[in-house]
Amino acid sequence: MLSKSSVEVIREDNATHSFCGLASVGWLYQKIKDSFFLILGTHTCAHLIQNALGMMIFARPRFGVALVEEEDLSKEHPQLKPLIEEIKADHHPSVIFLMSSCTPEVMKVDFDALSRELSTPELPVLFVPASGLDYAFSQSEDSVLQALSMFCPEAEAGDKKVVFLGSINDAVADDFVAEAEALGIPVGGFLPSNHFNDLPAIGKDTIIAPLQPYLAKVATKLSRERGAKVLTTQFPLGPDGTRKFWEDLAAEFGKKVDLSAREKAAWERIKEHTDLLKGKKIVLTADTLMELPLSRFLKNAGADVVECSSSYINRRFHGPELAALEGVKVVEQPNFNRQLRDIESIRPDLVVTSLMTANPLAGQGHIVKWSMEFVLMPIHGWSGVNALAAMFTRPLRRKAALPPMDDPAWTAGIMPSAT
């Protein structure tokens, strides 16, 4: 059911400021254990991947960069067959994801044709658009899941099960399966699954339960092409969102459950964090597309969410989250200069922001939190409640623990000539 929301979304005019979408390789190659991610890019892409993921080449990770050289400019598309054969011999993957980057996109490389040429019945090579020209940091996972979805088996009519949509670590996934079973909800699996050959069956009686707020396109694709029903509810982040998620999912299977006591207990467990968050002015700048559910959690935790901005807001997919943000300023594609002026004027207690703006804001005396960390940490469901709350309070506690600049603690033990 589509949630009606009276919350006004202010649409501004700025380009997306987000970390490179290629970084999604960092969590997806670990999740899909028989995959290989091949990025067609430049030396800049290779430098980013090696440094951002903290992986040296001798570790033989299941990802790599095929470098675009000057000679490739005169070709229809780069010659990758020898590299594919090398990957097959070294890693024995079940699937290879061919990821685009900015330079090949500008060169107009025909990735669809290239992936078809490289694919075999035994080893599909799937094109994944991930260029930072078009996609935010987290949206490349959406592209990967769209490519995978065509290989999901067709579920039989009447086989009503839930398929959880979105990459979460194995321990959290086990918690979701256990919770579903405790509520009497049959589980069809996860997309993505741990192995390419274990993809869940999806059909017209399947309930798709999105776990991440940046998967609107693949959810729509599964609804249109398979007839599956997409659960429209809050995302399972925080006690409030987790309760709503499970109650609404149970209702899809004809089960009425009341998890109010469970939610209350979860809030009680994080009271030391919510006490610190109460009344704190917080600004979330656009980066990961997780800003809406994070703002909803902060609002219900007692914080004053001064602004929640996001690169992209889907009124249907994000409807329940928008409805919960009554009284919060919500901005889509925020104007960067206006936002910086407002932050300087408001002087919020915490700014959740991208890597690009974190250090400059910290240099102006603001307390900042890297927004990309929320994509990488296990913060979903009941088991992730404490980790989620702690991510907001940790920078506040760190700041409170620092002595003032004129405190002797900073110069203790330093030679007199250095002071």
Curated annotation (Swiss-Prot):
GO terms for molecular function: 4 iron, 4 sulfur cluster binding; ATP binding; metal ion binding; oxidoreductase activity, acting on iron-sulfur proteins as donors; oxidoreductase activity, acting on the CH-CH group of donors, iron-sulfur protein as acceptor. Binds 1 [4Fe-4S] cluster per heterodimer. The cluster is bound at the heterodimer interface by residues from both subunits. It catalyses: chlorophyllide a + oxidized 2[4Fe-4S]-[ferredoxin] + 2 ADP + 2 phosphate = protochlorophyllide a + reduced 2[4Fe-4S]-[ferredoxin] + 2 ATP + 2 H2O. The keyword Nuclease does not apply. Coiled coil: none annotated. GO terms for biological process: light-independent bacteriochlorophyll biosynthetic process; photosynthesis, dark reaction. Keywords: 4Fe-4S, ATP-binding, Bacteriochlorophyll biosynthesis, Chlorophyll biosynthesis, Iron, Iron-sulfur, Metal-binding, Nucleotide-binding, Oxidoreductase, Photosynthesis. Pathway: Porphyrin-containing compound metabolism; bacteriochlorophyll biosynthesis (light-independent). Its EC number is 1.3.7.7. Its cofactor is [4Fe-4S] cluster. The keyword Membrane does not apply. [4Fe-4S] cluster binds at C20, C45, C102. It is an enzyme of class 1 (oxidoreductase). NCBIfam families: DPOR_bchN, PRK02842.1. PANTHER family: LIGHT-INDEPENDENT PROTOCHLOROPHYLLIDE REDUCTASE SUBUNIT N. Component of the dark-operative protochlorophyllide reductase (DPOR) that uses Mg-ATP and reduced ferredoxin to reduce ring D of protochlorophyllide (Pchlide) to form chlorophyllide a (Chlide). This reaction is light-independent. The NB-protein (BchN-BchB) is the catalytic component of the complex. Belongs to the BchN/ChlN family. Protochlorophyllide reductase is composed of three subunits; BchL, BchN and BchB. Forms a heterotetramer of two BchB and two BchN subunits. This is Light-independent protochlorophyllide reductase subunit N. It comes from Chloroherpeton thalassium (strain ATCC 35110 / GB-78). The lineage of its organism: Bacteria, Pseudomonadati, Chlorobiota, Chlorobiia, Chlorobiales.
